[in-house]
Amino acid sequence: MKKNLTILFLFFIACHIIAQERIVPLRYGDMEQWTVRYIKESKLLGGKTKQLYVLAATDTLRGNQPYDFSKTIWGISNAYANVAGIAKAACTTQPDKRGKGTCARLDTRIETVKVLGMIDIQVCIAGTLFLGEVNEPVKSANDPYGSINMGIPFTDKPKALILDIKAKVNPERKVIKALGLGMSEIEGHDEPEIYIFLQKRWEENGKIYAKRVGTARHRFAESIPEWRNDYRVDINYGDISKESYFKKYMGLFPDGGQFKARNSQGKITTINEVGWADADETPTHVIVMITAGCYPAFYGCPGNALWVDNIRWIY
């Protein structure tokens, strides 16, 4: 009898905790709406028409025009580039079937640019979704984050991000380095990852500064062959640098990233993280990135893939 009462008590406690949590879906995070873009590449590259996708309201756009990312909270690794008048499109993130609905598939691929039928440039691109926007057309590959306004205004303090997830991870310890001319291998293990940085930003003389309010960063070292629903990525607030779980890549920029954002003058400039905020401070912006690879731009393991669906905040 006493044992039964204990089990019943624990059950009610668990129900109470669950009832206290509030779940808020991110806009378009159910992956059921996509904008399809048709971009015609330059004749020098073969003149093919490529499909690009944006995680945004259902729509079809034709023509080599920059996308207006104010229509969505999501930036994406799919890029329309126009360098010196040469138009190019690259697609590494796309909708994929899941049951009767749709999820997002993020792939790491080698993107090859052929000029007049000959291989000229090869770059490694990891499929990525992130909160922010891309400043199109991309005009240079020399500064991968120079065209990205990273993060969105955000003043909430969620407990965690939850989503449905599946992953394909190559166990080999090698990473392809493909920055343009030629490819090489380095030792390492490329892993899909999810990270969340809550920041308190301010601007001085056109420069953007930030303190880190909240942090979550999780890498997937092994494949997840079957869907894992409601996967939880907990957010920790304040200075986590002395915690047992802390790893260097969770640290302040540049360890945690080398991202940029648009300042009040409309210029994309570096986000300078200058310290950890107190745990009780309120953020001004949030960065969320979901990506098929954990290495810097143009490094990765082709064949790695990440599937995601139903992205939500927990409060």
Can you name each region flagged by the protein language model?
Residues 1-25:
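Bacterial Sec-dependent N-terminal signal peptides
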Residues 173-178, 207-209:
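A short secondary-structure junction signal
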